[in-house]
């Protein structure tokens, strides 16, 4: 399921963000596995609180990175939604 700019993403209830001190990398943990996150992926997921829309998340990141990121954020979250790690609140 593709998310839109008005979707309000939240993590699947059994998934959680963590920092792997061995790898020195952020990870998304879920019962069946782990997704290794780069700093940008971690920044996106930290903003997925079930209150902010995809557009609001992108706006925060655009200010932080001085770049138009809406399409990239939407694509990234849609891919995680397809894997059922993110849902539209």
Language-model regions, residue ranges each:
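Acidic, low-complexity/disordered tracts enriched in E/D and polar residues
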Residues: 1-46, 74
């Amino acid at each position: 399921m593709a998310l839109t700019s008005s979707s309000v993403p939240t993590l699947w209830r059994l998934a959680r963000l963590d920092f792997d001190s061995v790898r020195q990398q952020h990870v998304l943990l879920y019962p069946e596995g782990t997704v290794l996150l780069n700093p940008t992926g971690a920044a996106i997921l930290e903003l997925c609180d079930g209150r902010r829309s995809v557009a609001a998340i992108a706006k925060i990141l655009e200010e932080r990175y001085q770049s138009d990121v809406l399409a990239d954020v939407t694509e990234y979250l849609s891919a995680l939604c397809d894997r059922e790690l993110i849902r539209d609140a």
